[in-house]
Amino acid sequence: MSRWPSRRHFLKTVLGSAALLVGSGAYAFGIEPAFRLRIQRYTPKPRNWPNDLPMWIAAIAAIHIGEPYMPLSRVDEIVATTNALAPDLIVLLGDYVAGHRFTTRAIGMAELAPRLAELRAPLGTYAILGNHDWWDDRTAQRNRRGPIIAARALHDADVPVLENEAVRLAKDGQPFWLLGLGDQLALLPPKDQQSGRKRLQGVDDLAGTLAQATDDAPAILLAHEPDIFPKVPNRVALTLSGHTHGGQVRLFGYSPLVPSRYGNRYAYGHVVEDERHLIVSGGLGTSILPVRFGVPPEIVVVDLGAHRADIASLAPAGPEGTAA
């Protein structure tokens, strides 16, 4: 008997592989980025977060508004799902505007911000800004400063924006700090910069933000890009970030392309280094290309302190629920 496969077997293998590739491509372009939505839960145990201060935080990252992948109806679904989780606090981690050119209808912040204002939590909803929010504002790029369009729209919708700012909140009489960092990649290289290595410039001020936390109450830091994490001191119990989209393509815990100088180190999920905790959301939308594979759009829920009941009993029936 020949050791070589028959022609029929060879053709079946080739055609089957081709069908798998076509199907995977259709899923990555048409299904996962536009229709899937999961709840991703984390239960970190930061050393400097008191166990008797239970906190249920919902984090929304990288909406990247724009049809057909992120229409306003999809945002309404995300808002309704988040509200149904009944979080104590909601945080928006930046990148609200479209991140690629594959849009059939552009949707501005003036339309998106009122939808986000429908988010409900006892301790409120707080936002930071992302690099795409800055890059989309040509006036801000020309002037090398804000406030940018996204910040003004959120402000007009009564959604507070923290840009190198700290706010002191309290739950059940126990205080904590919420710190919002300015974007680390906000300013594109000037057009007249013709030679040399072109560098993006940030508007972040970590030291100035930390200095506003004037007592020893525990602190949570919102930072759009996770690359700041090595500089975050133990003073901060938890850092929440977005930006990476988990690489948009993620297989077996590995992302081939991650928009971070650290590669897969901070690509996605819960990271603990030197007893410091970071959670990186995979976000909701897409940038560069409208592709997601292995990292579905997600709403992140962070369960701090004494943990709540299982998330399956709290999430609505539609979106997928997962725990981590």
How would you name each of these model-derived features?
Residues 137-159, 171-219, 229, 292:
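Binuclear metal-dependent hydrolase catalytic cores centered on His/Asp/Glu-rich metal-binding motifs
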Residues 22-58, 77-80:
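C-terminal segment of N-terminal export signals and the immediately downstream linker at the start
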Residues 60-61, 90-95, 125-131, 162-164, ...:
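Active-site neighborhood of phospho(di)ester-bond hydrolases with catalytic His/Asp-centered motifs
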Residues 56-152, 156-160:
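Membrane-embedded segments
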Residues 54-64, 175-185, 220-223, 277-283:
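Active-site-proximal beta-strand elements of phosphoester/diester hydrolases
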Residues 46-57, 166-178, 272-277:
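Beta-strand-turn-beta hairpins that frame and shape the catalytic cleft
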Residues 1-21:
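N-terminal secretory signal peptides and thylakoid transit peptides that target proteins
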Residues 220, 225-303, 308-310:
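Conserved beta-sheet core of the metallophosphoesterase superfamily
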